[in-house]
């Protein structure tokens, strides 16, 4: 497992594919991309996602993309799902989504997996069938109803979350040495304690 630290610039996270490439040993098989990013909330741009696709194709890597937060995007932002960007250029990816985060129905234990590469999809299906697991019927119904009828509810939720974020950011900025990262998506917050001069454990105890 290789961990590639992102670059923090102007209070935002950016991918560092050069750093990742320098750490590679040549036996890597998979790259995992969280899009939008959790917990930093970054929505990767079209160009950033294209760069990841080029990187994976160059090194013959399977790209696993977690887009579970793709619906929880601030009203003023837009998330572009990976398949719409790469078209037929790069098909060696596994895209995972779910309605569970967006509609708070994690108890349904349901998700979606999209694999355009036929060979890779066959391998995935065989491995999945071998587990003996079957889809959760209740979860399937929950997900379908949410996708078909939940648009108005989701629009209201996103506006509500944006107001919460604005209030949270304002209050955090009023606290000396703390700053809140600007979040494009998700319902999470990411606060920088580095200027306090305290250790991670000390800050944890204070919280």
Identify the residue ranges that each predicted region occupies.
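PLP-dependent class I/II
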Residues: 1-207
């Amino acid at each position: 497992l290789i961990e590639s630290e992102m670059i923090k610039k102007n209070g935002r996270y950016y991918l560092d594919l050069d750093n990742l490439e320098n750490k590679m040993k040549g036996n890597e098989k998979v790259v995992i991309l969280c899009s939008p990013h959790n917990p930093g909330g970054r929505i990767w741009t079209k160009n950033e996602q294209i760069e990841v696709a080029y990187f994976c194709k160059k090194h013959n890597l399977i790209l696993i993309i977690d887009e579970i937060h793709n619906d929880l995007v601030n009203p003023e932002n837009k998330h572009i799902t990976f398949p719409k960007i790469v078209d037929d250029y790069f098909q060696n990816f596994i895209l995972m989504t779910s309605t569970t985060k967006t509609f708070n129905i994690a108890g349904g234990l349901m998700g979606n997996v999209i694999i355009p590469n036929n060979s890779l999809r066959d391998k995935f299906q065989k491995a999945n069938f071998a587990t003996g697991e079957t889809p959760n019927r209740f979860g399937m119904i929950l997900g379908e109803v949410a996708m078909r009828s939940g648009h108005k509810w989701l629009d209201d939720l996103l506006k509500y979350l944006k107001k919460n974020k604005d209030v949270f950011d304002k209050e955090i900025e009023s606290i000396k040495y703390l700053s809140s990262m600007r979040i494009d998506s998700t319902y999470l917050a990411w606060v920088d304690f580095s200027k306090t001069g305290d250790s991670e454990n000390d800050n944890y105890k204070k919280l």
